[in-house]
Design a protein with these regions (language model features):
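Short amphipathic alpha-helices in soluble, non-transmembrane regions
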Residues: 16, 62, 171-178, 205-216, ...
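Glycine-rich N-terminal segment of FAD-binding domains in flavoprotein oxidoreductases
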Residues: 1-73, 268-270
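Conserved glycine-rich FAD pyrophosphate-binding loop
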Residues: 32, 73, 190, 214-297
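A conserved active-site cap/scaffold subdomain adjacent to cofactor or substrate pockets
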Residues: 158-219
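A short linear hydrophobic-aromatic micro-motif
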Residues: 22, 181-186, 254-258
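FAD-binding subdomain of flavoenzyme oxidoreductases
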Residues: 55, 71-181
């Protein structure tokens, strides 16, 4: 199934529901043909897109107006996949994950019902926050069909430093307790802390000088961020931790990309763990509410 419109997607899921046919979003039903920029309100720093648009295409369209979606996960996923799988990259340090950038969504439920919530402006507070709810849902609650997103201006300048250290937790602590405002801050285990500054040329130069005076380091090119995303992309596990546990977590890792602000480490091994009873109950209730027939699997 490859719907080319919202109504066609709704009709396909309605038919599948009537037949009792299970559907896997992304496999049985592709959003590849739902790939348009529907609106770009540059003055409001927002856009509305179909969920099948790939980040590379959206970046190119937004760049024409000097703006960007501050989301940089590995590869070139669709916007819908970024929400459904909670995909983000180094820029999440300053700009957050998809749930922080989504303003509104249009969904198609398993029975073909179309549901919209949120809005196109940053101050909208009406309705249920379905946008945040479907982040990380893996396509099991609804098809994400359209998304309204918060944007940011393209930075005029950027610069990266890399600090080689035996105490990455100390470097991170010093940076995060300072007045510096990096756009990205990753620990590449073992022994490197990468820091990205963006903004006007003068502001970037000033922050770069302050950072080097505080923690040392040398300037580096964007290759370090490509490495961080590549290592994240091939990681087999995602380890969550409390910010205060950074030092303890780093001491247990031989190789990883660690995002201290998000409290997550991408590691080259599978990470066990089962949701607790309360979390499983919430998941079950959400599934019963949004897809009681169990069409979306």
């Amino acid at each position: 199934m490859r719907p080319a419109s919202l109504d066609e997607a709704a009709a396909l899921l309605s038919a599948a529901s009537a037949e009792g046919t299970a559907v896997r979003i992304g496999e049985d039903l592709s959003t590849a043909a739902l790939d348009r920029v529907l609106e770009h309100e540059a003055g409001d720093l927002t856009c509305t897109v179909e969920a099948g648009i790939r980040l590379s295409a959206l970046r190119a369209a937004l760049a024409e107006r000097g703006q960007r979606l501050s989301l940089d996960p590995p590869g070139d996923p669709t916007v819908g996949a970024c929400l459904a799988a909670r995909l983000s990259g180094p820029l999440s340090h300053r700009f957050g994950t998809p749930r922080d950038l989504v303003l509104g969504v249009t969904l198609v439920l398993g029975d073909g019902t179309i549901a919209s919530a949120g809005g196109k402006v940053v101050k909208n507070v009406a309705g249920y926050d379905l946008g945040k709810l479907v982040c990380g849902s893996e396509g099991r609650l609804a098809l994400i069909a359209r998304v309204s997103l918060r944007l940011h201006p393209l930075p005029q300048a950027s610069s990266t430093i890399v600090v080689e250290t035996d105490n990455p937790a100390g470097v991170v602590r010093a940076l995060r307790s300072s007045v510096l405002q990096p756009s990205a801050l990753d620990v590449l285990v073992p022994g490197r802390v990468a820091v990205l500054f963006e903004g006007s040329p003068g502001a970037v130069a000033a922050q770069l000088d302050s950072a080097r005076a505080l923690v040392g380091g040398v300037e580096a090119d964007d290759g370090v961020w490509e490495e961080a995303r590549e290592r994240q992309g091939r990681a087999l596990g995602r380890l969550a931790f409390a910010p205060g546990d950074l030092g303890n977590v780093l001491s247990t890792l031989d190789e990883a990309v660690v995002r201290p602000a998000a409290g997550v480490a991408y590691v080259p091994r599978r990470v066990g763990g089962v949701p607790d009873a309360a979390a499983r109950q919430i998941q079950r209730r959400l599934k019963e509410r949004f897809d009681p027939a169990g069409i979306l699997v």
